């Protein structure tokens, strides 16, 4: 069998895939001895997604030889949503062109997902000269995006030495969420210079769907530069988004 991968906690893995599937229709997953990785760009080429899951976060990880498999993300998401929090998730691939997805809990349930041909693009995650780094709780970011969606289709991030502000302005109303390090929701703030940039709310909303309320989210950005959003999965795995800015006229 080319590979067998076991992850304890099917729902956590499902949330991860659901977040990526909000932005991309299909993806090429690289399965190597080191772990599972995927890098893709949404069809409009506004956001890049980078997923890295080292073998150490899995309870069992056996790979005979490196392989890249193409997956329809919507179909994968729908199957994974059938898993429960306490279910063990088992991903297997034999010699046939199927991914076998098994949930072990009160019963053993197995799905077979046909693999597809996906064009592998050479995508780089660039090192950018960000001037602001913000670490905050997932709940704070998710609620700010919901608040902002009531008044605008873009959300402005403003980082100063001692405060981080998220602001949205509509034709008739506006909303502002302000945080300092005295607030429980802001965990860290590093600012080289006052930094301002705006981003599309629809993309931000998709990017945070799989983030838990207590998860730590790291934002890195510069003035009118892309936003890099990172959050960790079991300390060592990481999901990264790189979102193009909404340049204001």
UniProtKB/Swiss-Prot annotation:
Name used for this protein in its record: DNA polymerase sliding clamp
Subunit-structure text: Homotrimer. The subunits circularize to form a toroid; DNA passes through its center. Replication factor C (RFC) is required to load the toroid on the DNA.
Signal peptide interval: none
PANTHER family named among the record's database cross-references: PROLIFERATING CELL NUCLEAR ANTIGEN
UniProtKB keywords: DNA replication, DNA-binding
Disulfide bonds: none
Family: Belongs to the PCNA family.
Lineage, highest ranks first: Archaea, Methanobacteriati, Methanobacteriota, Thermococci, Thermococcales
One matching Pfam family: PCNA_C
SUPFAM superfamilies with a match to the protein in the record: DNA clamp
GO-annotated biological processes: leading strand elongation; regulation of DNA replication
Species, as recorded: Thermococcus gammatolerans (strain DSM 15229 / JCM 11827 / EJ3)
Sample GO molecular function, one term: DNA polymerase processivity factor activity
Function per UniProt: Sliding clamp subunit that acts as a moving platform for DNA processing. Responsible for tethering the catalytic subunit of DNA polymerase and other proteins to DNA during high-speed replication.
């Amino acid at each position: 069998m080319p590979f067998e991968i076991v992850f304890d906690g099917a729902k956590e893995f499902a949330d991860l895939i659901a977040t990526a599937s909000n932005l991309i229709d299909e993806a090429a997953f690289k399965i190597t001895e080191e772990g599972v990785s995927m890098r893709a760009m949404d069809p409009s080429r506004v956001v890049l997604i980078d997923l890295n899951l080292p073998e150490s976060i899995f309870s069992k990880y056996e790979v005979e030889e490196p392989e890249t498999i193409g997956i329809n993300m919507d179909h994968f998401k729908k199957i994974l949503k059938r898993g429960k929090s306490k279910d063990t998730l088992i991903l297997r691939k034999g010699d046939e062109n199927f991914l076998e997805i098994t949930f072990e809990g009160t019963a053993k349930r197995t799905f077979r997902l046909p693999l597809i041909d996906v064009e592998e693009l050479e995508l780089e995650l660039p090192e950018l000269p960000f001037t602001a780094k913000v670490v905050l709780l997932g709940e704070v970011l998710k609620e700010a995006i919901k608040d902002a969606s009531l008044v605008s289709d873009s959300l402005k991030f403003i980082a100063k030495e001692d405060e981080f502000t998220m602001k949205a302005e509509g034709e008739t109303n506006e909303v502002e969420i302000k945080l300092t390090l005295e607030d429980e929701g802001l965990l860290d703030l590093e600012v080289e210079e006052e930094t301002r940039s705006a981003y599309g709310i629809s993309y931000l909303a998709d990017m945070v769907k799989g983030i838990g309320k207590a998860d730590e989210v790291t934002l890195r950005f510069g003035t009118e530069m892309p936003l890099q959003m990172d959050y960790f999965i079991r300390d060592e795995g990481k999901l990264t988004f790189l979102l193009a800015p909404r340049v204001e006229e």
